[in-house]
Amino acid sequence: MAQRSQKSPPPPELAADKAAALRLTPVSRETEARLDAYVALLLQWQAKTNLISPATLPQLWTRHVADSLQLLRLAPDAKTWLDFGSGGGFPGVVLACALAESAGGSVQLVERNVKKAAFLREALRVTGGAGQVILADIGDSVDRFAGQVDCVTARAVAPLHQLIGFAKPLIRQGAKALFLKGQDVDAELTEATKSWKFSPRLHPSLTGGQGWIVELGAVEPQDQSAPTPHGASV
């Protein structure tokens, strides 16, 4: 659980944004405490390690935290999650903070950057989030989780066609994929159909703007005889 003695109010410039985010995606007091601890840590590390775009800091809660939390409503029964390229912790650490209240809930956070992986480990330690950090390329870490994951996620990591290639072994074993995408979602869907057969469900982001969530439940290669394309390492 988040260390309440270390909890401090959000900076004044973020207070209104936090309130707006929690109106969009309400959470328990315990999860809010974990998220407060996470945001405070992220702001400390941001000064020395570029975890998120500085231009988005004024909307950290709505642009990043709420954007991540909204995935939970699309997979309410999912217990085990796998987050590709967790980076600064969106959505992985946010999900771990929320799932800490769920019996058996956990997130595996895959990140190949050593500094970012160190931040993710510290974030899980400080918040008490339910998760584990895996320092590896996505393509090198997927097969071990086939049949063990309920939901796979990714945000600002790779084009959709590559994400599908990585996630296919998990989806084949029953996992749902939820990929957060932006204004180029139509172009990415068009490109992905060149390699994959799939029927996506598109959900507009609760945070507004041009964000979308691509939900996938079944995928197959366009050419069944060709090797499964995994794309470049990420």
From Swiss-Prot:
It comes from Rhodopseudomonas palustris (strain BisB18). It catalyses: guanosine(527) in 16S rRNA + S-adenosyl-L-methionine = N(7)-methylguanosine(527) in 16S rRNA + S-adenosyl-L-homocysteine. This is Ribosomal RNA small subunit methyltransferase G. The gene is rsmG. GO terms for cellular component: cytosol. One of its GO terms (molecular function) is rRNA (guanine-N7-)-methyltransferase activity. Its main location: cytoplasm. Keywords: Cytoplasm, Methyltransferase, rRNA processing, S-adenosyl-L-methionine, Transferase. It is an enzyme of class 2 (transferase). The keyword S-adenosyl-L-methionine applies. InterPro entries: rRNA_ssu_MeTfrase_G, SAM-dependent_MTases_sf. The keyword rRNA processing applies. Belongs to the methyltransferase superfamily. RNA methyltransferase RsmG family.
